[in-house]
Amino acid sequence: MLVVSGIILTCLSGLLLTGVIGTRFSWTERIGLSFPLGMTLQTVVMALLDLMHIPLTSFSVLSAGAVTFALLMFIVARYRGFESFRITSAMLDDWKQANLVWVLLIILIGYCEYMNFSKCMFFPPSDRDSLAAFDTLGFVAAQDHTYMRMSLFDTDYNPSIHRAGGSIAYAPFVQMSYAYVYILGAETSKSIPALMYLFFVIAFYGILRRNTGKTVAALSTLFMMMAPEMLAFSSLSTTNVMQLSLIHI
């Protein structure tokens, strides 16, 4: 339950952050960007908590997330307004004017995403980078309630990690995102890459839809998903999918 609450809070914060960034996003773009932006913001907040020597517990990270959400609400209300968040009938034009080709493409996109998401959540992390660094560091950070001072970084315990190329030199944000779900009680970190890919697909379609017709946007999205590496990206790699999603967006 805490994991679901944390993910919802992260998405809502990301949704508000799109309102801070600009007012011309479509709802498809806002939804697609909500999780990547929200998780980026959440990991920054967790890093700040760690710098202030506040233990990373479910209470502290959710409380900090709630404070961040309230702050974003204030900024949007004070400086941007909520007019751009209004839901109008024009947003349903794609469905009202749907053609058979577009509907079939959307069904195929949904099936490919379901296949990818299911496989991602079923198989545990298996790639070397995750097991040697990202996933392991996230799990240990959740157990130690800190990233900077975690036991794996102890020179006496693990001297090799301080050598050139050691995982201690990696930017902590991927590991922090994994630690976030582990702190909230998740059994695996695979929900992060699975959701990253899901929201990336939504944002990809939304950005294309802004500049092209709905059928072309759906066809291009399907072609992107069916590329050999992208078809099972999040189910096979728990690290690269996050960087790829953010770079493309």
Per-segment meaning from a language model:
Residues 166, 170, 178-181, 188-196, ...:
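Membrane-embedded glycan-lipid processing machinery
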